[in-house]
Amino acid sequence: MTNPQENVVWITGASSGIGKSMAFEWARLGYKVVLSSRRKELLEKVAGDIRHSGGAALVIPCDILEETAIENAVQQIILAWGRLDVVIANAGFGVFGNMEKLTAKDWNRQLQGNVTGLAITVKYALPHLKKTNGRIGLVGSVGAYLPNPNLGAYGASKAAVHSIGQTLQVELLGTGVSCTTLHPGFVVSEITRIDNNGVWHPERPDPRPSNLIWPTDKAAKVMVKAILKRRRNYVFTTHGKIFVWLQRWFPGLMRFIISKSPKPDS
């Protein structure tokens, strides 16, 4: 790639959590950062912090549930900065509830956001990434590999992300573009505090073991490193790697462990 100061990275879901921390990490490395999510006021705060530190940031609000918004975002990036070197499809959310409770509306919303939105983000970025031998980062989850009681729709969506990543790794052979699928374990996020209608509930407790949850800045560093190294598939957090290993070799034990673990509320 060229000098990092000439390179442009576009991050969806950049207003909070992992996306926000990745924005700071790419900016620290000298990349121009394009920030997208639905929450413009939070994006402006992230952009302001990046600029205050001497970096370059561009805010382009975008709802990944709308294809035209994604297409327009890419057009704005090229109009403003003339190129695109990295796209990180990070935007997403969780829909909670057991299989008996989830409605068609719940399933459609989950898959449209975490699967279709991600795929369409890549679709419109690809023509420009091919011009720069660029990089794609898809944010999945260790849930792609595991049973997911009360999170079946979410787990299915992340399994689809894993499949999309594998497909892209074949389709992009010879193009110079790499695709890294990132599967984090527990990382600090708002996901358990947002209900199935997208309403935030700050009072909701996080059922995940607090001693296993990584801070977002730690996660961002290893994710950016994996993308830069053009890794194909990257599972991280120590417990995440252990869970995936157990599921592969001792699935009965993993089912038992998960059955005894706290479940998120719907």
What does each model-found stretch correspond to?
Residues 15-16:
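Conserved glycine-rich cofactor-binding loop
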Residues 98-99, 103-108:
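Substrate-binding pocket helix/loop in short-chain dehydrogenase/reductase
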Residues 61-72, 104:
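The beta1-alpha1 cofactor-binding region of Rossmann-like NAD(H)/NADP(H)-dependent oxidoreductases
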